[in-house]
Amino acid sequence: MSSTIKLYEHNQKAYDALLDMLGERDRACVIKPTGTGKFVIIAKMVQDNPDKRFLLLGTNDYMFNDQMANLAEIAPGFTPENLQFMTYSAAMMTARRGEEISGYDVVVADEFHHCGAEKWGKGVTHILDANESAKVVGFSATPIRYSDGGRNMADEMFDGNVAYSMELEEAWLRGILPIPKYVIAFYEAPKELGRLAKSIAGIKDEMVMKRFQKKYENLRRSLTEAGGVREAIAKHLKKRDAKVIVFCPRVAKLREFMLLRREWFGAVNSEIHAYKTVSADPYGSEDFQAFKDDESDALKVLYCVNQLNEAVHVKGVDAIVMVRPTKSPTVFYQQLGRVLSSGGNRTPLVFDFCNNFGSIVVAERIPKRMEETFKRLTGESKQLPFTPSDFRIIDRTLTFRQLTDEIRKSLKQQAIEDKITFLEQMAQLNGGKL
């Protein structure tokens, strides 16, 4: 006998709102942060409607298998035989072959922002055309396609029918997701200092240059005294047997960072178990599983490239390390979600060693949105267990970035003054005319 799926209060509200909207309309979506249990809502709908056939579209097979494994823990004995899974890539191939995939009562698009992609979108359209009478349901944490002109797929695909929406800041303040401690530092401080020194050397005004040189020397000294990556990790990561995920930009960098593991993490624990997973590695899934299963006293570190960004949940992760620079809010939140949904340390750690927080406008506005959300929720007489001040940002690069901005403005002003001088000289040569 299978277990009945029971939803947390916030998911029950989302589920009820979704059913209400589907009672009136053919399409509806739910927007909730990663880690709040979107798949459980899907499973609940499938369980409550055994006479209906569901087709779930998602990004990869591993995601579905991972979610089904989690479902087995939540609802032992429940095997949803009326649910079929298909990747967006497979849907695209059926469209190319002209193969009809029909007979479904409900089509569910997980991470539905992907439906706006040119090739995957054609596959989704092909599926929906073959199931014209089906209800269409979508789930996503990030409905906006930031890299695609800011397209809102909730509007495009669901006609703006958002049944329920919760932002990350609300999930934090309500205690649905743990609020992380966010540490910003440089992993290449000497290189960054070298670039800054070169910029200062380009200043023509000697007095201005000397002023910046003095500031630079104070900054260099403070960065040296504060230490680098090793010191930052040792200061904040106190759990010796922690599980850590390191997001790397490419395979070459992954190898480099793996070689640095003792330098970076050695002050936390001398015994380090290192694992890696990359999209092109046939053994990556084995390493990933070994990382998840490792319950030893060692510090466990998983290095990854183009993996674990989306829809994959790892229990017990205590920290993530960002060394993959990105301008994409979607990628930023996907990586952040790996530690928020982990169920590990109550105060998970985020080590941002490439200033993603300061490089992405959406991320930089998190503190302000926390304040706005807190004001809105308390105005609705909601009792909140956390306040905006619980989101702690330790920024070891702030002074550096402020000085860099100041120098950049000075160089810009210098360039403007050079242009004015040039124009004045041209005017003199032409009898006062340009």
Where are these predicted regions, by residue range?
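Interdomain helical connector at the RecA1-RecA2 junction of SF1/SF2 helicase-like NTPases
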Residues: 2, 148-242, 382
